[in-house]
UniProtKB/Swiss-Prot annotation:
CDD domains in UniProt: RecA
Xref: Pfam families: RecA, RecA_C
Annotated source species: Ureaplasma urealyticum serovar 10 (strain ATCC 33699 / Western)
GO MF terms held by the record: ATP binding; ATP hydrolysis activity; ATP-dependent DNA damage sensor activity; damaged DNA binding; single-stranded DNA binding
Homology family: Belongs to the RecA family.
PROSITE patterns reported in the protein's UniProt record: RECA_1 (PS00321), RECA_2 (PS50162), RECA_3 (PS50163)
Protein name as catalogued: Protein RecA
Annotated ATP binding sites: G65, N66, E67, S68, S69, G70, K71, T72
Chain's role: Can catalyze the hydrolysis of ATP in the presence of single-stranded DNA, the ATP-dependent uptake of single-stranded DNA by duplex DNA, and the ATP-dependent hybridization of homologous single-stranded DNAs. It interacts with LexA causing its activation and leading to its autocatalytic cleavage.
Subcellular locations according to the entry: Cytoplasm
Length: 333
């Protein structure tokens, strides 16, 4: 018999029970396979590609992209949807760029939105930690990662090089809040920006700010890219944005959709309903005419939309049938 075989074998469960709290360990089959709840983004297209119907609760989401590609609009529309369900949202406005009028146009209830303006990245993470621990916040939006300046940068001279300070801040801060997120009912959105890598000749020359920590800790990463301008005659009235779930730990990743973001009022929800109604055959097309329940309701897309918007009862019927199909598809995924 080997010497090691003579050693007393201890019951691992009993040993853990004696030293640690029961909440720190469990048997694998005790884990409940619960469906992750989510907050709608206000866009059916985006909700669908997330695979969970929006921004996951108890998880970290990163929304990143180039300037004017719809990042802030998605975040604000998510705040509005959170409030519609009776939830409480907090915006950490590190950039100091919050537009009251635009938020109001997106149906954000300004009387219920809590806004904070932390001076440093450390202060921002302290606020996030405090808010999560209250157990009363449903959504936290951080705008933006690029503006989460480390305290060391405030104290340093302009000539001092502080390599990696931002990345270290993000790594430490996310490491602190991640364990809290696992037990919370709070969703967090970090808005981030793309930067050009210096001296990059091969591969993707773009990178997000703040190092690699957010990529690691985020359960969902959404990329936005401006695909085209939307024009009405010679006037530019909005942008068409390509939205991609670059990372998704809760559903299949790399799903893509295109959304219309109109200047001054965000997503065109009515258009999205019509898109899906046509896709699922709720609105049928024969030649140039569109039909609903065998009734002719519009010749061409523009007339179809005008007819639906003028008839609330008809639009409600189309919407309810369409959303039933969309939700049924999510259930069967």
């Amino acid at each position: 018999m080997k010497e090691n075989d003579k050693l007393e074998k201890l019951d691992p469960i009993a040993t853990l029970e004696a030293k640690f709290a029961k909440s720190t360990y469990f048997i694998a089959d005790e884990i409940k396979n619960e469906k992750v709840s989510a907050i709608s983004t206000g866009s059916i297209h985006i909700d669908q590609i997330t695979g969970i119907n929006g921004i996951p609760v108890g998880k970290i989401t990163e929304i990143y992209g180039n300037e004017s590609s719809g990042k802030t609009t998605i975040a604000l529309q998510t705040i509005a949807e959170c409030q519609k369900k009776g939830g409480t949202a907090v915006l950490l406005d590190l950039e100091g760029s919050f537009d009251l009028n635009y938020a109001k146009s997106l149906k954000v209830d300004l009387t219920k939105l809590i806004i904070t303006q932390p001076q440093t990245g450390e202060q921002a993470f302290d606020m996030i930690e405090t808010l999560i621990k209250t157990n009363s916040i449903d959504l936290i939006v951080v705008d933006s990662v690029a503006a989460m300046i480390p305290e060391s940068e405030y104290q340093a001279n302009m000539s001092e090089a502080l390599m990696g300070a931002h990345a270290r801040l993000m790594s430490k801060g996310l490491r602190k809040i991640q364990p809290l997120m696992n037990k919370s009912q709070t969703a967090i959105i970090f808005i981030n920006q793309l930067r050009e890598k210096i001296n990059t000749f091969f591969g993707n020359p773009e990178m997000t700010t703040g190092g690699k920590a957010l990529k690691f800790y985020a359960s969902l990463r959404i990329e936005t890219r401006k695909a085209d301008l939307i024009k009405e005659g010679i006037n530019k009235i909005g942008i068409k944005t390509k939205v991609t779930t670059v990372k998704n730990k809760l559903a299949p990743p790399l799903q893509t959709c295109f959304i219309d973001v109109f200047f001054g009022h965000g997503f065109d929800y009515d258009n999205e309903i019509i898109d899906f109604a046509i896709q699922y055959g709720i609105l049928k097309k024969n030649g140039s005419w569109f039909y609903f329940d065998d009734n002719k309701i519009g010749q061409g897309r523009e007339q179809l939309k005008n007819t639906l918007l003028k008839n609330n009862e008809l639009f409600t019927q189309v919407s309810e049938k369409t959303l039933a199909f969309v939700n049924n598809e999510k259930i069967n995924q």
